[in-house]
């Protein structure tokens, strides 16, 4: 397979995790370049994705969201990095703060 894959967001929405957790998790439906349509999780606080955004996705499921088997990669293509992120920055596409 591929380590990452490019795709276009067809729907950006929130879902609720399964018990015993409770939250509004940000996810997006992505139509990949190979024609697959998958659901991808958007990690980090806040995001700028909307319909027709071009995103890069990587593997990695979200254990409390059924059917979500991919993560969007922050800080590439149309996905902005997380603002004011101080720790674990490379995972969220944040530059080193001055």
Swiss-Prot record:
The molecular function terms of the Gene Ontology recorded here are: rRNA binding; structural constituent of ribosome; tRNA binding
Provide the residue span(s) of the region labelled Disordered.
Answer: 79-98
Per the record, the domain of life is Bacteria
One GO term of the biological process aspect: translation
UniProt keyword terms in alphabetical order: Methylation, Ribonucleoprotein, Ribosomal protein, RNA-binding, rRNA-binding, tRNA-binding
Task: Using the record's annotations, give every residue carrying the modification 3-methylthioaspartic acid.
Answer: 64
One cellular-component annotation, GO: small ribosomal subunit
A Pfam cross-reference name: Ribosom_S12_S23
Composition-biased stretches, type Basic residues, lie in 88-98
Q: What does this protein do?
A: With S4 and S5 plays an important role in translational accuracy.
Assembly and partners are described as: Part of the 30S ribosomal subunit. Contacts proteins S8 and S17. May interact with IF1 in the 30S initiation complex.
What this protein is called in its record is Small ribosomal subunit protein uS12
The record's gene field reads rpsL
